[in-house]
Design a protein with these regions (language model features):
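Domain-level signal for Mg2+-assisted phosphodiester chemistry and nucleotide/NA-binding surfaces
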Residues: 2-109
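Nuclease catalytic cores that cleave nucleic-acid phosphodiester bonds
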Residues: 93-202
Length: 202
């Protein structure tokens, strides 16, 4: 049996020597995980640094970084609305493709749905060989299975990995089932912090 994440086509397809990687970030899931596991007070991670670090460690050629998040309504929560508006704008100047929508009561299903659709759509259109998903949301297992079926139908080699925050003292955490699970420890996380604080000062 192939290891988790290794998705085969109808036959034993050849592993490409250069693996095109797309990194998909579930922004809110990563933030809440950082808050619980590492005690971070705000989303201080840098998606570009994280994606580059893991891609380099794995020998993958990072092609694109995609970031998805809900944003609170500016009237209901102006603090976090402005934080995300500024952080997303900064990401855009660095080539990150961002997707956001206004959400209420922290309901992010529309955002998660878009991320899952993009993972599947970009597999079908052969845009990547590796999907690196920064999330622990098990709702994405369905998208992973669809990518697996795409690999079989198109007789292609595709790898799906999920990166998640890990601290032994916190307890058991894991990535998305059916993927290669990549741990991000505190040392790696601290090396990939965004130096800019986008919080509005009072």
């Amino acid at each position: 049996m192939p290891p988790a994440g290794y998705l085969l086509g109808e036959s034993q397809t050849k592993e490409p020597s250069e693996k095109r990687c797309y990194a998909f970030f579930d922004g809110q899931n990563l933030y809440h995980s950082a808050r619980k596991v590492f005690g971070c007070a705000w989303p201080n991670y840098d998606p570009v640094l994280l994606a580059n670090r893991i891609s380099a460690d794995k020998g993958w050629n990072l092609i694109k970084v995609l970031f998805y998040t809900g944003i609170p309504d500016q009237h209901e929560n102006p603090f976090w609305n402005q934080f995300w508006v500024k952080k997303l704008a900064a990401m855009g100047t660095r080539g990150v493709q961002t997707y956001s929508r206004t959400v209420k009561n922290n309901r992010e299903k529309g955002v998660d749905l878009r991320l899952g659709i993009d993972v599947v759509r970009m597999a079908i259109t052969n845009q990547y060989d590796v999907a690196l998903i920064f999330s622990q949301d098990q709702d994405f297992t369905e998208a992973v299975e669809t990518v697996k079926e795409t690999a079989r139908l198109q007789n292609r080699w595709i790898w799906v990995a999920s990166a998640f925050l890990y601290d032994q003292a916190y307890g058991k955490t894991a990535g998305i089932m059916g993927t290669e699970m990549i741990r991000i420890d505190k040392t790696m996380y601290d090396a990939c912090i965004d130096p800019t604080d986008y919080r509005t000062r009072k």
